[in-house]
């Protein structure tokens, strides 16, 4: 198959103003725009700024009051002023309402309640409430849980404890970040969202059992969890028989999938390891436990056709005792690797590819070094136990750098990585490599020629991409 060099169409285009073009600064062409266009422009800026623009033109003075998109940041605007602003609002329908505040229980509860009630009474479609970290968290009135117009809700730093029946009959998208709720309370919320399609849970650490078996239309699930330094990590069981797409960033792989039988696309990595590996208040994490976790997780992905794995999970696959824990054969056709090109991911990638007999396409996104890699955390544990790290890692290929040496890669190292991918696949048709900045621009042509030869010899279409930086 042919290997094509990136076209000029992928390069940034620069425009220069002609010396012969004059600009008449005295013409107010914006004021001639229809109200709907001006309101659309206002929807991209905070409401406070939109109001201030009224001094620029009498024509604009009342345009903001009918814009369907309202956005308030209480870091700069007082609660009293926001409610005064809302009193001047004249439109009957709000499409989106965003409110961010450093919530104070004593001083702000009344104003927050008034603002939310205002949005709800105007049949808001998209509601976003971000309460900066505070104690206690904001707790909603009962009326919040009954609304037929809401289609999307995004909440941060709130307590969700409905004392009434939840009825969000139009809600399709629910996103919760740093929210506190019990398993029972969240189940009540889900029961009131009959057409929910997408659910995002970030750092909602109080949830232990996520039962989505009655959410028949829920097809997208995103979960992000983190283990706090001075608290042990709690596991979460997930029952989600109808989801098609999963994005998971889990701390130490503590999510257990009871049922994800409809899953066809997964994007998975392990986020952090520090509390149990770098602090001694808890029992240290045995590397063998990591192997069991990743094996158990992959077993639940046997119907997945599109799979994305991150650098930490790939390093977990590279631990030397993995042969004693056989990996399942997967039906993945499209594989994406988000990784650094380092020695500690190479064995894991090779082993993974050998268990993907129907693989057609690989996409590699090269990433920058991070502070939560498995290799240094596991080594820290092994050193504390007077164990030899070499007995745990299968790092035979010294061609690739270790993480502490990771900088700009030589073309021959990147070529060796591509050869590794091709050598461990039999049905591959396409290889895409997003280089980012890991290969110097001055040596891109050299790598291009190497890839051209590989493409011809292996009968695989290879595409190289790099950032404009």
Swiss-Prot record:
Gene3D superfamilies membership: 1.20.1280.50, Ribonuclease Inhibitor (3.80.10.10)
One Pfam family of this chain: F-box
Coiled coil location: none
Keywords noted in UniProt: Leucine-rich repeat, Repeat
InterPro entries: F-box-like_dom_sf, F-box_AtFBL13-like, F-box_dom, F-box_plant, LRR_At1g61320_AtMIF1, LRR_dom_sf
LRR-type repeats, residues: 30-58, 178-203, 204-214, 223-250, 296-321, 341-366
UniProt xrefs under SMART domains: FBOX
Membrane spanning residue stretches: none
Residue ranges occupied by any F-box domain in the UniProt entry: 27-77
Protein name as catalogued: Putative F-box/LRR-repeat protein At5g02930
């Amino acid at each position: 198959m042919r290997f094509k060099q990136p076209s000029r169409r992928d390069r940034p285009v620069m425009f220069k103003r002609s010396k012969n073009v004059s600009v008449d600064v005295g013409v107010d062409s914006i004021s001639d725009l229809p109200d709907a266009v001006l309101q659309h422009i206002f929807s991209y800026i905070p409401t406070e700024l939109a109001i201030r623009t009224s001094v620029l033109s009498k024509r604009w003075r009342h345009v903001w009051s009918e814009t369907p998109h309202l956005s308030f940041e209480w870091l700069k605007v007082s609660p009293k002023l926001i409610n005064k602003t809302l009193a001047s609002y004249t439109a009957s329908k709000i499409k989106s309402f965003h409110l961010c505040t450093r919530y104070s229980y004593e001083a702000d509860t009344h104003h927050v309640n008034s603002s939310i009630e205002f949005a709800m009474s105007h049949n808001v479609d998209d509601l976003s409430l971000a309460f900066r970290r505070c104690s206690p968290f904001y707790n909603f009135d009962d009326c919040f849980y009954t609304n037929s117009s809401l289609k999307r809700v995004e909440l941060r730093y709130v307590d969700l404890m409905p004392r009434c029946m939840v009825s969000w009959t139009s809600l399709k998208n629910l996103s919760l970040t740093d929210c506190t709720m019990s398993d029972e309370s969240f189940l009540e919320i889900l029961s009131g969202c009959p057409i929910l399609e997408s659910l995002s849970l970030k750092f909602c650490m109080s949830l232990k059992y996520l039962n989505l078996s009655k959410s028949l239309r829920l097809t997208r699930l995103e979960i992000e969890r983190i283990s706090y330094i001075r608290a042990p990590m709690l596991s979460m069981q997930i029952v989600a028989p109808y989801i098609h797409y999963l994005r998971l960033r889990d701390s130490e792989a503590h999510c257990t999938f009871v049922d994800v039988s409809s899953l066809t696309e997964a994007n998975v990595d392990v986020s952090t390891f520090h509390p149990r590996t770098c602090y001694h208040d808890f029992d240290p994490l045995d590397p063998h436990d990591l192997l069991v976790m990743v094996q158990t997780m992959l077993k639940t992905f046997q119907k997945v056709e599109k799979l994305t794995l991150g650098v930490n999970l790939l390093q977990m696959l590279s631990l030397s005792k993995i042969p004693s824990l056989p990996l399942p054969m997967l039906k993945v056709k499209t594989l994406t690797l988000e990784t650094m090109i380092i020695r500690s991911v190479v064995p894991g990638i090779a082993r993974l590819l050998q268990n993907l007999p129907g693989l057609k396409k690989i996409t590699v996104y090269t990433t920058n070094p991070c502070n939560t890699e498995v290799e240094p955390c596991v080594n820290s544990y092994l050193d504390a136990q007077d164990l030899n790290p070499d007995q745990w890692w299968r790092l035979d290929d010294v061609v690739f750098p270790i993480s502490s040496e990771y900088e700009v890669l030589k073309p021959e190292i990147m070529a060796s990585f591509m050869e590794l991918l091709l050598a461990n696949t039999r049905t591959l048709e396409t290889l895409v490599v997003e280089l980012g900045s890991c290969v110097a621009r001055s040596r891109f042509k050299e790598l291009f020629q190497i890839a051209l030869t590989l493409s011809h010899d292996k009968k695989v279409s290879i595409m190289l991409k790099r950032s404009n930086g």
